[in-house]
């Protein structure tokens, strides 16, 4: 090698190291060490040097982050160690209960003294996207989204464009290392991105998380390369190939945990990851003892939340000692040694411009607040539910008021109440209309009911549209392609008046509609044909009878066997169906007493719709047992799980009670899981459910 070539090699190495250091200062510590112009000059110098000497280009060079060619689609990646969810806490009492459970368990195991407090590692709950990075021999070889926790999407090409993520780890990296962390976008970067998007006439993102998600799921990595994404590591998955002294020994009872690692605490492991060159949020990571220590940190960060450079939606508390984590173990695919402590809903004030009413599938009249646009909880809110007339009276909300609007996460925004000191003069109270704003039919409110209803039935276009959408839904007739926009067109042009009209649709008529071509029309007609032989329970559910859910519809169908028997049944006969009470029996009886509803059944038969009898319940150990499903399961959808439970003779309910036999909890399980624990109900994960069903 000539002296000139050696000098070029050394210069390239120096530039790569300097740029990497500037990336760490900017993307990890949020403390730029040089100007953008100076940074760009370094990049140009390195690019020119590598252009002159292609043999100097390395996989981890910052010049290799510009983005590869566009992808046709994202592949799937099976996580070597599942990416688990966390239990949630919202109140101080939840944190106190968490600390008590942890402390009691550790004392029983002899890992905590009688007067000793548990030690925790606290982290910010970043509002971004969870990602798993896989390094082999120190080189980034794969990156995947969390997905369902078991399997995610392959976003390697996009992840390689993020400057905060090292393409090559420092010396000492194990043979295999899975790193878990969060991809996010700073608020300031988000604002700049939206300004650029607006200037180009392109999509404006709602919030930083939305922008980060959209950027990471670009099929063209060159677009991702232009987005200011950041990354912080907060955990690990598979680890292999450490030195003999540090070789990990995986505990099968605690997936994802190891009995030996380079460090024996969670905080120590993050220090180890940082030492390998991975970005760790050292600025805000914190150690605390006992519940009071956790709550003190929560209050501190809550006060500083608005001044943080990025969005967070809470804190995460983890038992620090890895040995203690193994003892505590898991429940329903979530660790017992960790808790996500969420911040309360965000609130803002704005003007209530109007109160309008919407008409639902069963004729329910729901008041909706039309608001002067206000940014709250990460989105711009213009509408909020007011639930019913009594709720409006209770809150004393009036058109023209300044009102408090609350939103938390993806929850529907709600009007909390008026700011009375801002009320000017005597504003009139809201009065529920006496006639439906859509069809003009009378609105009635039955005694002891909070909801007012339009009496128009299928004569009302609003109810007709919602009823038809319900009937086409996945849990009813499952007519793929018959969506909201299409139903709206077909109702408005007079093609759809009853459910039977769906089965009169033809490809020629459909192809002439807006946004419908021949292929879409043919596919829809095929889906309609497939729906001509539904189970009797699905057909009964599709009719949209008030108070009749899918489980009740199935029970009634199984009891009577055919549609004529159901139509002819009086209330006494309906009450003989298990779990059917007077309200449901009365609702079904009244529905089929209406001549036009019976006529719809006859028209369906003329169109070749012939419901099939429901399979009879098995008489095994699960016969009659009630299951409740909560959260997202790794491989089964709720419909699949429900189908398997019903096939085994079990029942599926939407609420937990003393009669519940099992709660099947997946990821992001909520209040149902909490209630199950309180009542001592047996809790299963998906694997446990499958094992139970196979017995």
UniProtKB/Swiss-Prot annotation:
PROSITE patterns: BRCT (PS50172), DNA_LIGASE_N1 (PS01055), DNA_LIGASE_N2 (PS01056). SMART domains: BRCT, HhH1, LIGANc. Residues 617-695 form the BRCT domain. One of its GO terms (molecular function) is DNA binding. The keyword Cell inner membrane does not apply. The active site is at residue 125. It catalyses: NAD(+) + (deoxyribonucleotide)n-3'-hydroxyl + 5'-phospho-(deoxyribonucleotide)m = (deoxyribonucleotide)n+m + AMP + beta-nicotinamide D-nucleotide. It holds the Pfam family DNA_ligase_OB. Disulfide bonds: none annotated. One of its GO terms (biological process) is DNA repair. GO terms for cellular component: cytosol. Zn(2+) binds at residues 436, 439, 454, 460. The keyword Mitochondrion does not apply. It comes from the Bacteria. NAD(+) binds at residues 36-40, 85-86, 123, 146, 182, 318, 342. Keywords: DNA damage, DNA repair, DNA replication, Ligase, Magnesium, Manganese, Metal-binding, NAD, Zinc. Its EC number is 6.5.1.2. It is an enzyme of class 6 (ligase). Its cofactor is Mg(2+); Mn(2+). HAMAP family: DNA_ligase_A (MF_01588). DNA ligase that catalyzes the formation of phosphodiester linkages between 5'-phosphoryl and 3'-hydroxyl groups in double-stranded DNA using NAD as a coenzyme and as the energy source for the reaction. It is essential for DNA replication and repair of damaged DNA. Belongs to the NAD-dependent DNA ligase family. LigA subfamily. This is DNA ligase. It comes from Bordetella avium (strain 197N). The lineage of its organism: Bacteria, Pseudomonadati, Pseudomonadota, Betaproteobacteria, Burkholderiales.
